[in-house]
């Protein structure tokens, strides 16, 4: 069978393969441990999530204050407290949500306590093992976006367009294409810390998880 390089040469004539370390000079975003924000939900009145495995620390990103620990099996939501701030709320046994102290500005995160932590997003019926959940507000609508912050290789491992029984060279070629697209997007947009109003309004992300590319 063809090698990964031969496959890529067939579909992308004239293209060459470079290691990511050779293109990150002058591009600090590629040196970050987890530079990529993948949009999971956009413009929601609130964000619901679960701890399917492990635990996570819930934090307000503007101050770095971590409000509480979310434990395995718990259901949470993030949204407005009705007084100009945001809160995390935990679902009680009767199904109601109980806000936890303190409130904070509406830029927040859920940070895994362990590598084995798994977040569930009920609205998408999906779970996510790698990365931090990031909650951001749309400047236009005031509603909430949810993004998954993760490393480039974590994202590439999560891409499964080809079945596992395909030749290893095909899977390798797919990984190279996926990595290239992510790096290109990171270079175009830059660090999440520098998202402009348009990017914050759209999704607070570099790409959406249903991006057709």
Question: Can you annotate each of these PLM segments?
Answer:
Residues 1-213:
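Conserved, single-site charged/polar hotspot
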